[in-house]
Amino acid sequence: MIIPLHSTVSRRTALRGFGVVGLTAAAGLFATSQAHAASDLVVIDQKGTGPWGPENCGPTSAVIALVAAGRRVEHYVSGADGSAKGGNSRAVQEMRARCGLSPWEDPAVKTVDYTGAYLEDLEAGIRDTDGTATHSLFKEGLEASAHGSVVILHVHHGRLLGEDADYGHFVVAQGEDADGNLLVSDPGRAQEIGITGYSREHLRQARQGDATIVS
């Protein structure tokens, strides 16, 4: 189900990340060539991460960010096995619980009455994993990621990919590619795009909410 982010939707709803609910798979019209520069970003597919997979961009981004920041995430699977669909299902489902989105004993149940997640949910999960989460303005997040920090960005997925979709989404940025574009790992396009470079201006145009710097 897609929840349109028009003027009739509350500001709090507009600040939420929904994931990939209802968005068709595509490589993205405005994505540049695959990243060439070194980065600690990893690829994790939010699809196949349990009953809430289509809206798990938030918890998946939290796992990506923690791993990129060098933090230990329990049950994280690295390499090709981990980047495959469902490869990190357990790690993401446990992050849902750490974020307060589902109970530990039953990942099929929700403990919230909304679709997706808020940055504040992700920050709680990151801190529960002994990481540091610093809530920041979007432009500050872009600047920090350009200097090598790991940053979760709240973007409008349709504007990011150049597609006809209207909902918020979380991605993780860190570093730059050989062309000076910011490297972004998109959990909603793990198989089609993975880690890709976007210009800062394009990311600014895709802004939906704030950012969180993770260390």
Regions found by a protein language model. Give the residues of each.
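Active-site-adjacent structural segments surrounding the nucleophilic cysteine of cysteine proteases
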Residues: 2-112, 157, 164, 178, ...
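Conserved active-site-adjacent core of cysteine acyl-enzyme catalytic domains
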Residues: 83-215
